């Protein structure tokens, strides 16, 4: 699932400001009408003498982070005239009755009994992560332009580590515009400190462009061959889905500095994927959903498959596998010897289509003559929950024999109930295939022998019996080859598996051994691990949330599970990531917060040759942090029903504990996700705190990641239930704080966060949160894709009650909030616009009207099309300001001013005659 550039430094004027002299339906509150009545009475009593009205719109803009007028009182009327005592008493009596009635109703609304009041809630800690040099209380306010245009994004460098042709370690691929040194070159990390970039560099491409016939080719992406003699080049890249694209592909000869088409017979063909043989002698690629192979010794291209098309995919994933399983565009795997290619065959024949309509003419959307003014419709094979899934099988191509074959296995999952989530080549023609059932709670590890053409299940696990949870797809299983002389008599693999309630590293050896050696254990979790393995020294490198769920540090452990050691400082709060060289002797170490991020290239502890070089310290960003008034971050935990959950509170600069601040809750909350972390980040939430002066709180509730499987798995079959309770209980706890205005609380989120916003408002029914903003929300999980949804909900056929509970259906409860807003892009191929339309229909049926909706034509899930991203955030900001300024309270029950005035005058007349 999936998201987050102009408004000026001053807060926008309330959107509901109107000319009070208009004879129309107005949004004026009862209290405002009472004051207006008094002014009218004054004017009528003193015929011919005008009393200026109160200055409701004097051009000054209210800010919650300004302390000039803590009471927020209205200025006195100018030039007020005296009124006869009897009339004044009557008028003031009427005004008092009106105001009193309004206040009574308001406090009854705010003080009504709360749901879930019996919950055990404990808030712990108030650690201020603010450190000198990162957060300043003075300076300029964070503006929206800066947040949305990358002004606050840390500079970051990626290193493409590559193995040397002879096994050299510490080699990296450099690609830049320095044609003096060479556009594309391989450098030894040891020479990075040299002022002469040509030192020991192997130049692969001298210039950025090259000619093939009359055509000039400019690379979009490049992949050097393992022997570094040829470069596979993609040009003219066109995006498909989130991770996939097509392009024209070329082979560039390093020695001659010349290029040729990958397929000389079809140089303009749009290729979907291409990958090198480990021997550098051939390339396999997919075009028009069929696979081909080109041997470099010939210009001939040979087909591997021929029946690919609209419903059959070879070597690439379809939409749902790209989005929910592989998180990438490849379903092709070469074996280590270059003798076999494994690839996914995907059959979508039974998968229903979903039409995504595009209404705005743009470049690239070609219409037939006479159809230019009709929407363009793209039909996607999209399996919704409970609908038929694509059927997937692993097939193999024998490179030497030129034949495709499949391997049957006894006790395999049936086609309709099989997900293939990972493929890992071992040695000697053996391959590991991780499979799960459709509902992702039964795992099978299959060992396939491509040489003998046999297959067997070597390990299985039922997660529904283990802890009621599920298997998340990942691509991090690591093959460990046998090395008898180094204490490894058999092949094996490392996988992240559940152990005593937390995700840990397990080493399985031999390959068919179902009982592993656990390399890590404890009440903490490893993340997408291992990062790398030093096979010579038997060291496993991994990243873990060991010190705190909100932090990441880097560790090593030996293959026997001994000597777990950090390689970074674990005493200070930090969030690290790491990318290791192919031999694990060097690493790109990234420090991502909470202070200003930096990057270093280092030698790893086992490397006897010491090396360290800072390649980015973000000096410019550090200067900006000093010049701007950034919010202060307070990391805490809250315990709800025995579950300890991480919370971060963003306080405005110059925070005044004697003031009452509005609070905005921001959340995502999807299963296994994490929003509360100690990364340095200046985002929309930072803008809200710094510029608008509101407190922003985020709590990672039950179901989120790195707090243990018990807290994570409790949400299964009932998404949105416990997560909503956690948001509400946290908001109640914050509402009791002396510096929080509990009458001004809002919540917002995008995607799963949009769903959670609506579910929280639905459960809360206006008792805690008065406002909400939901962007691209799921409103019924039967509308979302099968693989993601059924992992957490089972199928609708097996869990009908759960799906009914998770749908946003109690719109009457939504009607009890002051106001909420829903935003969606009509071209969303991920969370379909159908979700919002269905919710709007439910609101219409139940006559609920306290909401706003904004639709962005042709925008997908990221909402970028035609300035949409910038406008969306401006809309969120303006809407929130109006909410916390009380504008939406004023328009809850609009009454024509003229009618109300007439009734008031009639009442006054009767009172005068009494």
UniProtKB/Swiss-Prot annotation:
Q: Where is the active site?
A: 751 (charge relay system), 828 (charge relay system), 861 (charge relay system)
Instruction: Report TM segments.
Output: 89-109
Q: What is its EC number?
A: 3.4.14.5
Compartments where found: Vacuole membrane
Q: Name one GO cellular component term.
A: fungal-type vacuole membrane
State the residue spans of region: Disordered.
1-82
Q: Which residues are glycosylated?
A: 128, 295, 347, 617, 810, 897
A biological process (GO) of this protein is: proteolysis
The record's annotation in InterPro entries points to:
AB_hydrolase_fold (IPR029058), Peptidase_S9_cat (IPR001375), Peptidase_S9B_N (IPR002469), Serine_Prot_S9B/DPPIV (IPR050278)
Recorded GO MF terms? aminopeptidase activity; dipeptidyl-peptidase activity; serine-type peptidase activity
Segments of skewed composition (Low complexity): 26-38
Q: Which residues lie on this side of the membrane: Cytoplasmic?
A: 1-88
Indicate how the chain sits in the lipid bilayer: Single-pass type II membrane protein
Look up keyword Transmembrane helix and say if it applies: yes
Vacuolar compartment ranges equal 110-914
Q: Which UniProt keywords apply?
A: Aminopeptidase, Glycoprotein, Hydrolase, Membrane, Protease, Serine protease, Signal-anchor, Transmembrane, Transmembrane helix, Vacuole
Keyword Transmembrane on this protein?
yes
Task: Name the cystine pairs.
Answer: none
Instruction: Give the catalytic activity.
Output: Release of an N-terminal dipeptide, Xaa-Yaa-|-Zaa-, from a polypeptide, preferentially when Yaa is Pro, provided Zaa is neither Pro nor hydroxyproline
Q: What does this protein do?
A: Type IV dipeptidyl-peptidase which removes N-terminal dipeptides sequentially from polypeptides having unsubstituted N-termini provided that the penultimate residue is proline.
Give the protein family. Belongs to the peptidase S9B family.
Q: Can you say what this protein is called?
A: Probable dipeptidyl-aminopeptidase B
Name of the gene encoding the protein in the UniProt record: DAPB
């Amino acid at each position: 699932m999936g998201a987050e550039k102009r408004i000026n430094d001053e807060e926008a004027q309330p959107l509901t400001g109107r000319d009070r002299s208009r004879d129309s339906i107005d949004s004026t509150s009862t209290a405002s009408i009472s004051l207006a009545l008094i002014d009218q009475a004054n004017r009528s009593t003193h015929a011919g003498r005008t009393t200026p009205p109160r200055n409701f719109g004097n051009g000054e803009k209210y800010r919650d982070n300004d302390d000039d007028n803590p009471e927020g009182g209205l200025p006195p009327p100018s030039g007020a005239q005296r009124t006869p005592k009897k009339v004044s008493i009557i008028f003031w009596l009427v005004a008092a009755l009106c105001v009193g009635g309004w206040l009574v109703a308001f406090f009854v609304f705010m003080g009504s009994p709360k749901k879930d009041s019996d919950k055990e809630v404990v808030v712990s800690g108030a650690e201020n992560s603010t450190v000198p040099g990162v957060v300043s209380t003075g300076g300029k306010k964070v503006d929206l332009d800066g947040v949305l245009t990358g002004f606050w994004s840390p500079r970051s460098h990626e290193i493409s580590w590559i193995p040397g042709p002879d096994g050299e370690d510490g080699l990296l691929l450099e690609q830049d515009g320095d044609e003096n040194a060479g556009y594309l070159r391989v450098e030894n990390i040891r020479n990075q400190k040299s002022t002469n970039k040509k030192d020991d560099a192997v130049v692969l491409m001298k210039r950025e462009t090259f000619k093939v016939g009359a055509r000039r080719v400019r690379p979009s992406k490049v992949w050097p061959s393992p022997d570094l003699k040829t470069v596979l080049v993609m040009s003219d890249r066109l995006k498909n889905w989130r991770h996939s694209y097509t392009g024209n592909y070329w082979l560039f000869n390093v020695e001659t500095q010349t290029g040729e088409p990958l397929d000389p017979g079809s140089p303009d063909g749009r290729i979907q994927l291409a990958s090198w043989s480990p021997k550098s002698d051939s390339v396999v690629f997919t075009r028009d959903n069929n696979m081909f192979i080109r041997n470099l010794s010939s210009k001939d291209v040979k087909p591997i498959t021929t029946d690919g098309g609209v419903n059959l995919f070879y070597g690439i994933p379809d939409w749902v596998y790209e989005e929910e399983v592989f998180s990438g565009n490849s379903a092709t795997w070469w074996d280590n010897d270059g003798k076999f290619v494994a690839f996914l065959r995907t059959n979508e024949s039974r998968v229903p289509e979903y039409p995504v309509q595009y209404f705005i003419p743009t470049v690239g959307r070609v219409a037939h003559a006479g159809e230019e003014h009709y929407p363009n419709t793209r039909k996607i094979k999209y399996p919704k929950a409970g609908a038929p899934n694509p059927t997937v099988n692993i097939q193999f191509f024998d490179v030497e024999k030129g034949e495709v074959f499949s391997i049957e296995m006894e006790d395999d999952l049936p086609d309709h109930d099989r997900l293939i989530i990972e493929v890992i080549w071992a040695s000697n023609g053996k391959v590991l295939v991780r499979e799960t059932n459709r509902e992702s709670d039964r795992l099978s590890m299959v060992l396939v022998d491509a040489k003998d053409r046999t297959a067997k299940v070597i390990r299985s696990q039922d997660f529904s019996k283990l802890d009621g949870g599920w298997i998340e797809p990942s691509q991090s299983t690591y093959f460990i080859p046998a090395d008898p002389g180094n204490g490894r008599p058999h092949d094996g693999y490392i996988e992240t598996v559940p152990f005593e309630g937390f995700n840990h590293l397990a080493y399985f050896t031999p390959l068919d051994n179902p009982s592993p050696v656990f390399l890590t254990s404890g009440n903490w979790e490893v993340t997408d691990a291992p990062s790398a393995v030093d096979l010579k020294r038997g060291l496993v490198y991994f990243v873990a949330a060991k010190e705190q769920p909100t932090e990441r540090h880097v560790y090593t452990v030996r293959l026997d599970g001994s000597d777990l050691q950090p390689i970074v400082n674990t005493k200070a709060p930090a969030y690290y990531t790491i990318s290791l060289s192919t031999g694990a002797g060097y690493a790109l170490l990234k420090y991502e917060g909470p202070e200003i991020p930096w990057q270093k290239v280092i030698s790893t502890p086992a490397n006897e040759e010491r090396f360290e070089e800072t390649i980015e310290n973000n000096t410019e960003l550090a200067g900006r942090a000093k010049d701007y008034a950034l919010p202060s971050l307070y990391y805490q935990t809250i315990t709800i029903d025995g579950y300890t959950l991480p919370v971060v509170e963003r306080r405005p600069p110059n925070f005044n504990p004697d003031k009452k601040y509005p609070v905005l809750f921001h959340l995502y909350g999807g299963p296994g996700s994490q929003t509360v972390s100690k990364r340095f980040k200046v985002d929309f939430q930072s803008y809200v705190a710094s510029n608008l002066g509101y407190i922003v709180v985020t709590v990672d509730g039950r179901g989120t990641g790195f707090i243990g499987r018990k807290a994570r798995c409790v949400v299964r079959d009932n998404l949105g239930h416990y997560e909503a309770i956690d948001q509400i209980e946290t908001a109640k706890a914050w509402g009791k704080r002396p510096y929080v205005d509990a009458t001004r609380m809002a919540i917002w989120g995008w995607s799963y966060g949009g769903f959670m916003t609506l579910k929280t408002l639905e459960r809360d029914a206006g008792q805690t949160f008065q406002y909400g903003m939901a962007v691209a929300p799921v409103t019924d999980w039967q509308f979302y894709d099968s693989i993601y949804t059924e992992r957490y909900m089972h199928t609708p056929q097996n869990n009908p009650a759960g799906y009914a509970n998770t749908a946003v259906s109690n719109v009457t409860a939504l009607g009890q909030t002051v106001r909420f807003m829903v935003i969606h892009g009509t071209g969303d191929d991920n969370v379909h616009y159908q979700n919002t339309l269905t919710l709007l229909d439910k609101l219409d049926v139940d006559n609920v009207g306290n909401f706003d909706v904004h639709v962005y034509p042709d925008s997908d899930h990221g909402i970028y099309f035609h300035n949409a991203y910038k406008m969306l955030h401006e809309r969120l900001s303006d809407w929130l300001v109006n909410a916390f300024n009380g504008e939406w309270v004023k328009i809850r029950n609009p009454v024509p001013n003229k009618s109300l005035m007439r009734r008031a005058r009639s009442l006054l007349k009767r009172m005068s005659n009494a």
